Amino acid sequence: MKRMMVAGFAGAAAMMIGGALGAVSNQSYSSLAQPRPVMDINGGTMNPMIGGQAMLPGRNLLENIVASPEHTTLVAALRDSGLTDALKGGGQFTVFAPTNMALSTLPARAMGEDKAQLARMMGYLVVPGKYDSRALLKAIGEGGGQAKLRTVEGGVLVARMNGPTNVLLMDEKGATADIAIYDVYNKNGVMHVIDHMLEPAMAARQVASR
């Protein structure tokens, strides 16, 4: 039964493409704590490095997460939860990627034994659509100081400013995380590195399949 639940969740997550809140704007905004990507001489985006490793914009989200030495625990959790296909396929997604240290605070049960709960936790870190720093700032401004981001798990992450230059995320339990590295661009979305784990509410939800 648990395998069926996980498989069903993963399949639904893979189908959640598009429909993100807000849109990328051409308007200029103040830079955030991390420097924005620069352009190389050929006009291609250059991503920030993670743990000394290059994050190539021509890769998909899963490939860059796998390449990051700071996200080995996240890679294992994504594989166990069955969400890897969603992050290497088509569509556009935003991933809020907790570091190994952030995930080390979770109990062993959450990371290994309860696969259905693990799938929910991983799906809560993924938002349909491309929310780079500019799009996040736009959504926060349009939301009167906060943006509610619907995740593929079905829950909501709240984004708001933490001081003049940083975005803070709050989960459904009231826990918060800062974005430590912004705007790691991939061919199927964008990744932001976060310094704490964010979790959905305990109550199970039905994941939308469209």
Indicate where each model-derived feature is located.
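Mature, structured domains of secreted/extracytosolic soluble proteins
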Residues: G22-R210
